[in-house]
Amino acid sequence: MANKDQNLTLWYDQLLSKAQLVSYGDVKGTNCFLPNSWNLWLQIQRLYNNATALIKLKDKVILKQFIPIEPLPYTVEQVQLPTLSFYSEYQKEKRHVEGFNPELFLIEQIGTKKLHDPLVLRPTSEIAFCNLWKKQSFSYQNLPVIYNQWTCVFRAEKNTRPFLRNSEFYWQETHGLFSDGVNSESAAIAFWKLYQDIIVNQLCIPAFVGLKSPNERFAGAQNTWTVESIMPDGQALQCATSHDLGQTFTKPFGLTFQNQANQQAIPYSFSCGISTRILGALLLTHSDDFGLVLPWKVAPIQVKLYLFDKKGDTKTVELAQKVQTLLEQLAIRFQFIKVENQLGKQLGQGEVNGIPFQLIVDNPQTVNIFNRLTRVKTAYSFEQLASRFVELVQQYHQAMYDKAKAVVQQKVVQATTLKQIEQAFNDKKAVLCAVRLTDTLEQQLKERYQVTVRCCLEQLQKPQICPFSGESAQDYVLIARAY
């Protein structure tokens, strides 16, 4: 494979191929997800579903040793909505249609019949959920209602790359309807924090979290909270977002509920989502020149156990069976393979596929463990393995985060002067700085430096000067080029 540090683009393309992650679709910006990538996406779905399920599920045994995902105090029910809607529906919310118009896939003809009202392939589902809820009856007693769907969406993109920017991609989108704005906003923040938990604590991806600027927030949102990560090339990648929608959609679509005063009132809504773009973040953050490197919590196969016994030694087989039983007791996702030849080839493919630990039993006394992160092979007796394996997994998890954080720290500059900022941009790095955030500044950043304000991390408590305008700064922000 190409060297990741020297040619990230070529390295990424080769990784997708060698790890058998995607096959390119016939239409630009579409991909066929192969088992290795889709199973990874299913594990991320599991994390989210477990935290939001009606019956809160808990990971078994070994996974409890990590920081667990804190289940949300909300009931989220799974639904599936249509892909098609009418273009006229999008025109009911001006900011929404203006924000999405350049990206919409429109169907203007069916067979030989031209459509008076074109159909839209779903770019997002705020409108579809409003139309669903409009057909239902609500009172303050049965609100909130929160629905989630795992689906695909369509947005026309000029420059496409698998996982990072696609014309068709997969995501989950959660939509909630509330009787008041305070609780709707609180839910948006709670789901945003859940994304932080998944991305940072489970996927080991360092992140910057905060509010989107008014120009970068979701079309129609009152506020958008984001989780941004910095990739090895210094570009930011938006990993997940959550939106306080207020009454932006519920009002024009005529949604009402019966309040405690027995009157009809307009409800409030929020939405949030994480997409297969997170797979791109995971690949770029952790993988190396030898292939995939996967976080323990989402690796579809966490351990591969090889029995390599050409002599048919009974005690070697018994040791392998003992290791198999141990892995079952620890509720680990593992694969047991009896190998008669070409063990090296099997281990090499396991390395490319990012298996966190490969265990080799080829004698009655020891188990060899190959650690994917460190690429070191170590021999353990069964007793040592049984007593230390949980610790090894914990070390793997922490070392993965620490390694990723060290790379991010090299790609982000804390700056106080315009000279420092411009030098960072020239070096293709992201910038943390205090600014007076205005439309003029955001336009200047795009036109002059080809960067954007990725998120506002906090409002300043102490006086600082904006290096761009010389005026009093108000926000501490992350500025970067973006995928």
Curated annotation (Swiss-Prot):
Comment block on domains: Consists of three domains: the N-terminal catalytic domain, the anticodon-binding domain and the C-terminal extension.
Protein's UniProt name: Proline--tRNA ligase
UniProt subunit comment: Homodimer.
Catalytic activity: tRNA(Pro) + L-proline + ATP = L-prolyl-tRNA(Pro) + AMP + diphosphate
Gene (UniProt): proS
Organism: Mycoplasma pneumoniae (strain ATCC 29342 / M129 / Subtype 1) (Mycoplasmoides pneumoniae)
GO MF, one example: ATP binding
EC number assigned by the record: 6.1.1.15
Domain of life: Bacteria
Keyword rRNA-binding: no
